[in-house]
Amino acid sequence: MQVRRRLAALPLSTALTLTAHAQPAPTIADEAAAARANALRNQQVQQQHDAEQREATVQAPAVRSTVPTDGAYPTLRDEQPCFRVDTFALDVPATLPDAIRENGASTLPLDRFAFAREWLDHYRGQCIGREGVAILAKGIQQAVLSRGYVTTRVLVPEQDIAGGTLSFALVPGVIRDVRFADPVTWASWRSAFPTRPGDVLNLRDLEQGIEQMKRPSSQDADMKIEPTGAPGESDVIVSLKRAKPWTLVASVDNSGSRATGKLQGNLSLGLDNPLGLNDVLSLGANQDLYFADEGLGSHGFNGSYSVPWGYWTGSLFGYTSTYYQQIAGVNQTFVSSGNAQTAGVKLARVLRRSQSDVLGAYLQLSKRFGASFIDDTEIEIQRRNNTIIEAGLTDRHYIGGAQIDGTLAYRQGIGGLGATPDPNPPTPRPTTRPTYRYRMAVLDFNLSAPFAVASQPFRYVTTLHGQYSPDTLFYVDDLTIGSRYTVRGFDGEQMLAGERGFYWRNEVQAPLGQSRQSLYAGVDYGRVFGPSTAFLAGTQLVGAVIGLRGGIASKYGGLSYEFFAGTPLYKPSAMSTSRVTLGFQVMAQL
């Protein structure tokens, strides 16, 4: 078995001494070249992973039910006779069962119908007649429906309002039962729905449940609400359609680098409902396709598992990357290699749902490991054992046919869970040396909006990603631009990097009839800032891209593809990149 040796990191002013070898030892310049290769490879892997996560967020299933919106307060006209009303009452009739009456009680610590009582208080002190009472009853019912309480009713009991009090009867709509349309369905609605029998029926809770049941790609769900014989009670009937519970996807693309293999093959297996909890398990592997070339190569593995519980979703994830390449050193050509592993856990929760908005939050904890080698000799300064915590807010908003997805997060490297200290010695000014214990703010924004020109449909898609850190970072944590995942039009062999920066991608898509194909054209811009940029010839990139996306479906599976060509529009003169970058991805799914 071959034993790897460690190469200690010394100051640049110190000579590097190694035990005797049959061939010349790597120099400090060789070590620096290997470090750059390792950092570049790690950035490429991280860019691809982040792009896939953002795409998954944008493409996540959404369930939206249409209910009347709560309009402005209606105006009461002058009428005779009318009576001044100083007090409004919104109470549950005493004739209803105790369980239903408790759900509408105004004495609850969190009165779910407090908004309705506040709505009525807007009319306190006004003179109200028969027509005014009808207007208020309709308006308060509209307000209740707009909040998702679609089976809750507001009625006007017989009364005399001459005493200055106007009473309304609130009949809370509750869930008697949740069941599947097919009684033999093997599935769990409890892991998906945040509500239970006996709870007040709110359409937003039901939307969340159906959305969670749609997470497995092989599963589609729908629901209907059926009234029962009892006042205020309804049954929720869930219809479930399923295809095969597994998905096998194979793809080929040219997203790699020349040093470790441009052509990359990917194979992934998805398992839906392995535990019957609307959970999803995904396993994958990737490998360069230059099997006969022993001088370069890369491969990796990835996996994830997620399970919902009402408004909560828990996830486990991990991915690895290994590469090797030949680098021409000062005295010899040597093999530079490296590996990286990332694993983490994420807990997300929906905080609020409405007809046009879903607000959420998440907390993520991850571990990151890595090492770099020259001819099987480890470069200790490149060894990583980091712990990173991240907390963020997410939001999905709809404006007409447009969809907006956004994330604002805070990320920080911490010292727990065995994380090793920074490899650099302390200095009087810690911000002048790179650190893995950084503080960082991250922003993601995506807008997808349809429009038409002369009856030809188009879609405009814009994506903005940015990060800000007051610290000096190692290259693996820098924002880099100049690849198919950031600013398109560049081949990704050289990229600009900085502690702070952003890139803005813009794309117009034109579907080709009903062929499931679309042409697209885009212009992207990116810029980096920070201490690291002092050594760059420039900090801005502009690139353009045109391409074709499409797919072919069959009863056995499907084939999807993308072909594109990009070119730089602006770059630093010293930056080397292809005049035209051609890219493709072909994916087959069973």
Question: What feature does the model see in each segment?
Answer:
Residues 232, 261-265, 297-301, 339-343, ...:
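Residues that define the transmembrane beta-barrel architecture of outer-membrane proteins
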Residues 130, 199-200, 254-260, 290-294, ...:
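Outer-membrane beta-barrel domain signature
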Residues 23, 120, 426-590:
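C-terminal transmembrane beta-barrel domains of outer membrane proteins
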Residues 308, 313-473, 531:
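Transmembrane beta-strand segments of outer-membrane beta-barrel domains in Gram-negative
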Residues 23-256, 262, 268, 285-299, ...:
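Periplasmic polypeptide-binding modules associated with outer-membrane biogenesis and secretion
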Residues 225, 250-254, 267, 281-287, ...:
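Transmembrane beta-barrel strands of outer-membrane/channel proteins
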Residues 211, 237, 268-270, 302-304, ...:
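Outer-membrane beta-barrel architecture
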Residues 246-248, 275-281, 310-316, 354-359, ...:
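Repeated loop/turn-to-beta-strand initiation elements of outer-membrane beta-barrel proteins
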